[in-house]
Design a protein with these regions (language model features):
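N-terminal pre-domain/capping segments
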Residues: 1-72, 78, 82-97
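Conserved, mostly hydrophobic/aromatic
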Residues: 27, 73, 91, 102, ...
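Acidic/histidine-rich catalytic cores of soluble enzymes
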Residues: 35, 133-233
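Active-site beta-loop-alpha junctions enriched in small/polar residues
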Residues: 13-17, 40-42, 74-77, 115-117, ...
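Short, electropositive alpha-helical surface patch
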Residues: 86-98, 122-135, 160-169, 196-202, ...
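Active-site acidic/histidine proton-transfer and metal-coordination neighborhood
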Residues: 64, 80-177
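Conserved active-site loop/cleft motifs that coordinate metal ions or position small ligands
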Residues: 36, 214-217, 256-263
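Acidic (Asp/Glu)-rich catalytic clusters
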Residues: 5, 25-31, 51-71, 96-106, ...
Length: 284
């Protein structure tokens, strides 16, 4: 039976536990048609090249099932704004490997939380971030580097203004943007109001970010508008609600974007078929 949303790319963050190719079956199990993965443990610094046999098998299966685009989410430990040289080097090496692995699986990008300036202010760390990202791009090929917005937590870098400053200064076609619906709401952008979404899209255009926006993290928020706390909820079960998320995903200038879910899931095991089905009912 055909569906008007069949062509919309909707997927979720899936596990590669047991091997890279398992991400394909995990995506099919939740009825996704695109995916996001970690290229290793999300809470360990160690990053290694994907085994060649797994890469070959994965690429073949992805093509067979038409499961693209594929995004890699960087380590949560990464902090390009740190004043700790050891942490900076670990962050750089982890991102370097993610970008290299991304190129081997034709990834549409590595999604990165830039990190925290730990009270020192964005202006004091901006040049350091720019220098490190430029170095990463110089030493890798093809794979885009996606900056994700923050939820407005104290010290965390990722407001639209900060992303704009980084994008303009780095000035590289591989620099792209990922926006998270829960983070926007938690940072004070009320997606429940259609006019606010319209103003957001205009703002993205003015800041030169709309053309660099390549995907949306579609998550409901467990916390209230402007909370500054990053807590995701299942689609339609949080403070944003179905109507608010619908405002976002159906905006004419956003409706081509892949939607990646990072929700708890009905059984607390992550994105599931029910959440993806709910998103299909929101899209038109």
């Amino acid at each position: 039976m055909s569906s008007p949303t069949l062509n919309r790319k909707i997927g979720g963050h899936v596990s590669i536990a047991g091997g890279l190719t398992n991400a394909v079956q995990n995506t099919l199990d939740i009825k996704g048609n695109c995916m996001q993965i970690f290229a290793g443990s999300p809470r360990m610094w160690l990053r290694t090249p994907f085994p060649e046999d797994q890469v070959t098998s994965f690429n073949l299966k992805v093509k067979e099932q038409d499961l693209s685009p594929i995004f890699i989410h960087a380590l949560y430990l990464v902090n390009l704004a740190s004043d700790n040289p050891e942490l900076l080097e670990k962050s750089y090496q982890a991102l370097l490997m993610d970008l290299q692995n991304g190129q081997r699986i034709n990834s549409a990008g590595v999604i990165v939380h830039i990190g925290s300036h730990q009270g020192r202010g964005f202006d004091s760390v901006k040049d350091q971030i720019i220098s490190l990202v430029k170095k990463l791009l110089k030493n890798t090929k093809d794979t885009p580097f996606l900056i994700e917005n923050s939820a407005g937590q104290k010290g965390k870098i990722g407001s639209l203004e900060e992303i704009e400053a980084l994008v303009k200064s780095i000035d590289d076609p591989r620099i792209k943007v990922c926006l998270d619906s829960a983070h926007m709401f938690e940072a004070g952008i009320d997606l429940r109001e259609a006019k606010v979404v319209e103003d957001l899209v205009k703002k993205l255009g003015t800041k030169g970010l709309l053309d660099r926006l390549v995907c949306l993290h579609l998550n409901d928020s467990k916390t209230v508008l402007g909370s500054g706390h990053d807590k995701h909820e299942n689609i339609g079960e949080g403070e944003i609600g179905k109507a608010g998320l619908s405002n976002l995903v159906n905006h004419p200038k956003l409706k081509h974007l892949p939607l990646l879910l990072e929700v708890p899931g009905q059984d607390k095991k992550g994105p599931d078929q029910k959440n993806i089905q709910t998103v299909h009912t929101l899209t038109n």
